[in-house]
């Protein structure tokens, strides 16, 4: 691996030090280099005195701390942009991921900015769960000397819109913190709100924080950014689909696809635990149906991000058509004066239920009206990429990336409907067809750095995807650590995803144990959480041996049920009461021994 070295004048190392560094890292793999980068970042964080060559007295350097609490990457991008704005203003700033934040130091923060998303039913992002729990515990300190601001990202189609940000904002104030600015709650189309908020934060902090010397602002403004790539959410790679294979049986109620995408010579890199972002296009048939229901032609010009496009093209490429929201229902009702929908206006619960059960196209079908093209565009939300847990390791598949896609299919009064991204991959992209993708790195879902560490993987349904990547990596590394998989689905014969591969891993000794839960193969429904309780004694032995626990899948039901089962196992076999078991599991989370990728 070769790296272009910056001019020596820009380096903090002398030529001899640089030569030693290059010699020490010349034969390291990308994964090893990434680990070394994170290691030195940790060393740096533990030695604050080394951050500046000539540190000023603490009273002159209160500094600004930005905590990024991100689930899909959007909050992290906003936090990074704010960090860059503050550095440009020559302010002393530090950006830290919530999962890396030593939250007991929060009492010493003078200027604190929180950028957070929300997941599930109003829960904080995975990396912020421990911080959230600490702030809401009896251990939380008073924050009378802390001024703070919160930017909250969410999706108004969900009931608990921006709840995590609301929680942080109210709790920081309750603990005595002073609001620099009122909290901002941003919807899916958050960019404009974020840009305005960042400018206000910079203005507010200029009067609070001293301007730092360049060496100080650069040093303390550093952040653990080990991933560099020319491809991103806003500049995706045009890759090609090479395999689209249905991996559920013909009689299964589920349509699950194994998708392989060829990355070519792009150099795009990922690690087990990362997600693949997929930009999709809406079904042309769905676009045609919606346009005709509104008595439009499809060639009407509309403005999208400053460009003029035909309506059909705009709807296919730029707007969300397969997810309805309470706001869309309410706005459509108001625009059209629909006798069916107007009674729902003002009743949040009824609006959300209607949106959850009635796609946009069927809302228009059931409550027909005539809208002009611009009115339709203004009603809709921008199309956003979907994220899929990566189901492969480049140690085995090299220039490919695999994902496991559960295709969303359902009927509305006899008319077939489907999910936007899942049906795009399953039905509309031909072999070798183009798929625009990017990697969403997830450092909060990583294999242990020590290959001897045991691993417990809990992933029912398509939640099995990242564990396929984990096993490919552990096999390639010849990691001696034990591996235990818990998997569940409705039927053994129809829904055992990647069955042959798991059987091979068991035979080869890579997979030490596998416990399977088939919920519909017997009268009594059995789920993975039941298997956890059944194997409680052995599970506790693995935990005592230092095992790392990973959970992937549904956030609203499965993940909560699994966590409850883990708490029961810890309490019973660890001889703890409920409160102590909860504290024990929280400590595992802080130690990165309990990680979740839930959605």
UniProtKB/Swiss-Prot annotation:
Q: Which residues bind NADP(+)?
A: 519-520, 525-529, 561
Q: Where is the FAD-binding FR-type domain?
A: 234-448
GO cellular component annotations, sorted alphabetically? cytosol
Q: Where in this chain does the record put each Flavodoxin-like domain?
A: 64-202
The coenzyme or cofactor needed here is:
FAD; FMN
Entry EC no(s): 1.8.1.2
The reactions it catalyses are:
hydrogen sulfide + 3 NADP(+) + 3 H2O = sulfite + 3 NADPH + 4 H(+)
Q: How is the cofactor bound?
A: Binds 1 FAD per subunit. Binds 1 FMN per subunit.
Q: Which UniProt keywords apply?
A: Amino-acid biosynthesis, Cysteine biosynthesis, Electron transport, FAD, Flavoprotein, FMN, NADP, Oxidoreductase, Transport
EC top class named in words? oxidoreductase
Q: Which one GO biological process term can you cite for this protein?
A: hydrogen sulfide biosynthetic process
The pathway it acts in is: Sulfur metabolism; hydrogen sulfide biosynthesis; hydrogen sulfide from sulfite (NADPH route): step 1/1
Q: Does the keyword NADP apply?
A: yes
Subunit organization: Alpha(8)-beta(8). The alpha component is a flavoprotein, the beta component is a hemoprotein.
- To which protein family does this belong? Belongs to the NADPH-dependent sulphite reductase flavoprotein subunit CysJ family. In the N-terminal section; belongs to the flavodoxin family.
**PANTHER family attached to this UniProt entry:** NADPH OXIDOREDUCTASE A, NITRIC OXIDE SYNTHASE-RELATED
Name of the protein = Sulfite reductase [NADPH] flavoprotein alpha-component
Task: State the species of origin.
Answer: Escherichia coli O6:H1 (strain CFT073 / ATCC 700928 / UPEC)
């Amino acid at each position: 691996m070769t790296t272009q070295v910056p001019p020596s004048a820009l380096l903090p190392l002398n030529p001899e030090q640089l030569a030693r560094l290059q010699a020490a890292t010349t034969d390291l793999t990308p994964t090893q280099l990434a680990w070394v980068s994170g290691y030195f970042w940790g060393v740096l964080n533990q030695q604050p005195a080394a951050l500046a060559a000539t540190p000023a007295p603490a009273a002159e350097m209160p500094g600004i701390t930005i905590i990024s609490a991100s689930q899909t990457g959007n909050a992290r991008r906003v936090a990074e942009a704010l960090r860059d704005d503050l550095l440009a203003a020559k302010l002393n700033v530090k950006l830290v991921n919530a999962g890396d934040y030593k939250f007991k130091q929060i009492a010493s923060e003078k200027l604190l900015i929180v950028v957070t998303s929300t997941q599930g039913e109003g829960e904080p992002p995975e990396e912020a769960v421990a911080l959230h729990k600490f702030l809401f515990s009896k251990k939380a300190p008073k924050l009378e000397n802390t001024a703070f601001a919160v930017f909250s990202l969410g999706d108004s189609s969900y009931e608990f819109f921006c709840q995590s940000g609301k929680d942080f904002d109210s709790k920081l104030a309750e603990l005595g913190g002073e609001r620099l600015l009122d909290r901002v709650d941003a919807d899916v189309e958050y960019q404009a709100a974020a840009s305005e908020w960042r400018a206000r934060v910079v203005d507010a902090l200029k009067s609070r924080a001293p301007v730092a010397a360049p060496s100080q602002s650069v040093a303390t403004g550093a952040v653990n950014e080990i991933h560099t790539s020319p491809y991103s959410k806003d500049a995706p790679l045009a890759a090609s689909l090479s395999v689209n294979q249905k991996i559920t049986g013909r009689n299964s109620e589920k349509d699950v696809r194994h998708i392989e995408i060829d990355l070519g010579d792009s150099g795009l890199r990922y690690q087990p635990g990362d997600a693949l972002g997929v930009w999709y296009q809406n079904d042309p048939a769905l676009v045609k149906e919606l346009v005709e229901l509104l008595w439009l032609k499809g060639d009407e010009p509309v403005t999208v991000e400053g460009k003029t496009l035909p309506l059909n093209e705009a709807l296919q490429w730029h707007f969300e058509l397969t997810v309805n929201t309470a706001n869309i229902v309410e706005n459509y009702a108001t625009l059209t004066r629909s006798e069916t929908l107007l009674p729902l206006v003002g009743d949040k619960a009824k609006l959300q239920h209607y949106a959850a059960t009635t796609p946009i196209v069927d809302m228009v079908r059931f409550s027909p009206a005539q809208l002009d093209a611009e009115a339709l565009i203004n009603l809709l939300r921008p199309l956003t990429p979907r994220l899929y847990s990566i189901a492969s390791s480049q140690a085995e598949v090299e220039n490919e990336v695999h994902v496991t896609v559960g295709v969303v299919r359902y009927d509305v009064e006899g008319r077939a409907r489907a999910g936007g991204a899942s049906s795009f991959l399953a039905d509309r992209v031909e072999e070798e067809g183009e798929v625009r993708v990017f990697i969403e790195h997830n450092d909060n879902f990583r294999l242990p750095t020590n290959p001897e560490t045991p691993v417990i993987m809990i992933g029912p349904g398509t939640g099995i995807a990242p564990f396929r990547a984990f096993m490919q990596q552990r096999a390639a590394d010849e990691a001696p650590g034990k591996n235990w998989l818990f998997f569940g689905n409705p039927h053994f014969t129809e829904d055992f995803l990647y069955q042959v591969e798991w059987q091979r891993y068991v035979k080869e000794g890579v997979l030490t144990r596998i416990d399977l839960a088939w919920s519909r193969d017997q009268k009594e429904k059995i789920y993975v959480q039941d298997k956890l309780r059944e194997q409680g004694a052995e599970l506790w032995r693995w935990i005592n041996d230092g095992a790392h626990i990973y959970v992937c899948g549904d956030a609203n039901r499965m993940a909560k049920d699994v966590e409850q089962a883990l708490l029961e196992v810890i309490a019973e076999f660890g001889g703890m009461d409920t409160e102590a078991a909860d504290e024990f599991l929280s400590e595992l989370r802080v130690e990165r021994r309990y990680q979740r990728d839930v959605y």
